């Protein structure tokens, strides 16, 4: 091969190598492109995967949020929601448009001293908060967050300016949550066993109880004054109306805390009142309530009619006056309603109050300012939830449950002591030594309550009640904090008359003794304890018949072995009135001020002490006599149904002295009757049928009941039927003609019975042919 051919071959080989190199390079670039494409696809897939994960996480969070908002909440979660969504939802109007007029407190009791309630802040509240938290734990017992938020939206939509608006706010944001939490506690066996939390409710319908009679009943409009005058002139005990120790006044707080008693009755644990937010300036609350002589200063300024020229001082003095008057109003309620606990609710604050029954002149106050104490919202409020309004009011309620409200004889005794030791606005305490201390000095002054439990448990209250202390983290048996009766040596809290109150309380606690004068006194304190007499017994008394051997008290009725009643109907009524004249509490006890009451009166259990007759009375106020008299005419028209379809009517009596009620009202008139029975149980299938039978029976006698309240239809086991009560709204008409003869009717009465009824019912005309009384 020539050199030329060899060169050509080498060139071809070079070109082929170059081509192969370029081809390899192209393949490498193609592979690189494919790798980059694969990488891009992988990154895209990863991005889609991450997006899917993010979307799934977001959806999971939303589901969890919705589940969280719709599921029930724990105790701490509920406190958080109530404060954040309800309490903070309050929006106040421009207060400059509203009057800052003073609360009307002239003539009302006010304390000499105002002191910090440090025992509540340092002992009671921490104890009860820990106790509730330990009982509830992490159980989801309370309403969901979305429910609380929805209510908060409604609250924030309405501006609050006056007391009515504050009323609605307090009910929604504070009272309803507190009642819900206490309801859970009441069903818990540990709390129930320790009597820490009974069934409870807030009640704001007090004004219905003692409002003046409007005359809207079945009674004739012109019967009251005339018939009362006739009764006073014609009655066997004609005497002028005696004056009572106290003047009845319109002492009606905005609300009371009602608790159920073990026996089924109801009693009040505390009193509360609402105030418009602009009438209790929160910027002055702490400084004002730290002044021991706040009331003395305010009363002196008002009496002297002195105003400072400095605008800031004027604002402070006006704020102090409004706060002092708000406290005075509730203090007066606490005294006259016989309770040691009360509070003022003013939207942005609660003023929790306590009075020691051994020291009437000192009012203890714990200001609750949740907005300041809890602060701004954060991710973790756990350590500040005890400062919320709901948490503090729960502890206040639980504290109040350990004290008993005074009633009857003990209430009147306590009011006698209060009248002797307290001044009414705007009288001055003559012995007040105003020291002119600054608020800081006053707040740091020694107080007996720092080391003393006596201001928590009054000497006048029943002993033997303990407060169980339970550690949240301990499984050991609960420790017990006994209610001590000892007082701090630094100050004597005893006031004149306190020993008399303790004596009355001790007698009430011991119950009746056996026989003698002391036994009568105990009976006056404790009230009747015997079983009710039977319908047949009291009907026999009224008709002049033999004793009922089935009456549980027949041995007390029987004298000298006789089978006849020892007194007639007229003598019976006269003796009851004489017994109540000596003391309205002698053999007489209100059954249940809050539960056993009708539209116009309250139920009493009475015993005619010498003979053991035990029956009931329907007591009412001075201005409601006409309605009782009307009811007496109804019973007269239903005469031969008495003791069967309706109770046995035994006449009207007057309590000249009056049986004292919470709030300084007095039961003055009382209608005496046999005990009708109990409310039918829900399991009684034929209750409605029996009710219609009884209604038909009275309709056949010309009576339309006019009050369909369920409480007016009672099951009487002795008669095996439904009895009807409360005829103050009933309407009378002549019986239908021809009158249907009821299978339930009794035999016709003897002629002499009508004359006996004429003495019982007073100057009413007797129509003997119809055996009924008409006006």
From Swiss-Prot:
Could you say what a knockout of this gene produces? Sensitises spores to SPOK2 encoded poison.
Q: Which of UniProt's keywords are assigned here?
A: Coiled coil, Cytoplasm, Nucleus, Toxin
Disordered: annotated span: 18-51, 211-249, 442-525, 734-761
Q: Where is the composition biased (Polar residues)?
A: 444-457
GO terms of molecular function: DNA nuclease activity; kinase activity; toxin activity
Which residues, by range, are in coiled-coil regions?
4-69
Q: Where in the cell is it found?
A: Cytoplasm; Nucleus
Sorted alphabetically, the Gene Ontology cellular component annotations on this record are: cytoplasm; nucleus
Swiss-Prot/TrEMBL GO biological process terms? meiotic drive
Job of this protein: Promotes unequal transmission of alleles from the parental zygote to progeny spores by acting as poison/antidote system, leading to poisoning of progeny that do not inherit the allele. May possess DNA nuclease activity that leads to spore killing, and a kinase activity that confers resistance to the nuclease activity.
Name of the protein in its database record: Meiotic driver SPOK2
Q: State the species of origin.
A: Podospora anserina (strain S / ATCC MYA-4624 / DSM 980 / FGSC 10383) (Pleurage anserina)
Question: What's the gene?
Answer: SPOK2
């Amino acid at each position: 091969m020539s050199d030329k051919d060899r060169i050509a071959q080498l060139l071809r080989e070079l070109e082929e190598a170059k081509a192969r190199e370029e081809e390899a390079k192209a393949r490498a670039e193609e592979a690189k492109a494919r790798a980059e494409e694969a990488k891009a696809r992988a990154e895209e897939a990863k991005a889609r995967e991450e997006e899917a994960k993010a979307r799934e996480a977001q959806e999971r969070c939303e589901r969890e949020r919705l589940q969280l908002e719709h599921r029930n909440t724990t105790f701490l979660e509920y406190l958080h929601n109530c404060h954040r969504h309800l309490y903070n939802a309050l929006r106040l109007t421009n207060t400059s448009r509203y009057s800052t007029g003073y609360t009307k407190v002239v003539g009302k009791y006010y304390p000499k001293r105002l002191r910090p309630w440090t025992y509540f802040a340092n002992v009671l509240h921490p104890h009860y908060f820990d106790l509730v938290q330990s009982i509830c734990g992490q159980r989801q017992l309370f309403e969901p967050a979305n429910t609380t938020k929805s209510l908060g939206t409604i609250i924030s939509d309405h501006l609050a300016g006056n007391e009515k608006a504050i009323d609605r706010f307090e009910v929604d944001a504070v009272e309803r949550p507190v009642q819900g939490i206490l309801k859970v506690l009441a069903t818990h066996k540990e709390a129930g066993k320790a009597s820490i939390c009974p069934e409870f409710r807030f009640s704001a319908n007090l004004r219905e109880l003692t409002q003046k009679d409007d005359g809207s009943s079945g009674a004739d409009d012109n019967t009251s004054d005339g018939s009362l005058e006739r009764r006073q002139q014609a009655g066997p005990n004609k005497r002028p109306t005696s004056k009572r120790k106290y003047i009845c006044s319109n002492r009606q707080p905005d609300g009371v805390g009602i608790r159920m008693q073990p026996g089924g009755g109801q009693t009040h644990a505390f009193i509360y009142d609402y105030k418009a937010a602009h009438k209790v300036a929160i910027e002055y609350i702490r400084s004002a309530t730290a002044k021991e002589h706040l009331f003395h200063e305010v009363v002196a300024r008002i009496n002297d009619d002195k105003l400072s020229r400095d605008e800031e001082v004027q604002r402070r003095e006006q704020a102090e006056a409004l706060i002092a008057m708000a406290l005075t109003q509730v203090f007066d309620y606490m005294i006259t309603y016989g309770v040691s606990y009360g509070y003022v609710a003013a939207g942005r604050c609660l003023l929790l109050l306590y009075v020691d029954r051994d020291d009437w002149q000192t009012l203890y106050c714990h200001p609750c300012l949740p907005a300041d104490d809890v602060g701004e919202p954060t991710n973790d409020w756990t350590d500040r939830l005890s400062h919320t309004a709901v948490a503090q009011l729960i502890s206040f309620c639980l504290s109040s449950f350990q004290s008993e409200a005074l009633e009857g004889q003990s209430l009147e005794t306590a009011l006698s002591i209060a009248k002797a030791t307290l001044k009414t606005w705007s009288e001055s305490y003559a012995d007040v030594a105003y020291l002119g201390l600054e608020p800081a000095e006053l707040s740091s002054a020694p107080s007996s309550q720092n080391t003393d439990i006596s201001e928590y448990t009054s000497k006048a209250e029943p002993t033997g009640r303990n407060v169980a202390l339970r550690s949240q983290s301990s499984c050991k048996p609960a420790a017990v904090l006994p209610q001590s009766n000892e007082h701090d040596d630094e100050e004597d809290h005893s006031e004149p008359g306190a020993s008399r109150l303790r004596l009355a309380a001790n007698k009430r606690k011991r119950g009746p003794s056996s026989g003698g004068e002391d036994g009568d006194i105990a009976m006056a304190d404790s009230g009747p304890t015997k079983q009710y007499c039977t319908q047949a017994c009291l009907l026999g008394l009224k008709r002049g018949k033999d004793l009922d051997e089935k009456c549980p008290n027949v041995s007390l009725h029987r004298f000298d072995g006789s089978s006849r009643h020892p007194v007639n109907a007229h003598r019976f009524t006269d003796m009851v009135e004489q017994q109540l004249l000596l003391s309205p509490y002698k053999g007489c006890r209100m059954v249940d001020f809050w539960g056993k009451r009708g539209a116009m009166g309250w139920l009493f259990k009475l015993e005619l002490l010498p003979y053991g007759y035990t029956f009931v009375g329907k007591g009412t106020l001075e201005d409601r006599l006409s309605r009782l008299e009307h009811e007496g005419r109804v019973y007269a028209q239903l005469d031969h149904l008495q003791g069967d379809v309706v109770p046995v009517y035994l006449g009207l009596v007057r309590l000249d002295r009056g049986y004292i009620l919470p709030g300084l009202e007095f039961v003055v008139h009382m209608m005496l009757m046999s005990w009708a029975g109990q409310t039918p149980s829900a399991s009684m299938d034929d209750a409605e049928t029996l009710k219609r039978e009884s209604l038909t029976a009275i309709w056949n006698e010309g009576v339309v009941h006019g009050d369909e309240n369920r409480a007016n239809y009672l099951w009487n086991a002795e008669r095996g039927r439904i009895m009807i009560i409360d005829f103050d709204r009933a309407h009378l008409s002549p019986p239908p003609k021809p009158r249907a003869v009821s299978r339930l009717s009794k035999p016709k009465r003897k002629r002499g019975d009508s004359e006996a009824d004429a003495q019982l019912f007073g100057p009413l005309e007797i129509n003997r042919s119809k055996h009924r009384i008409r006006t």
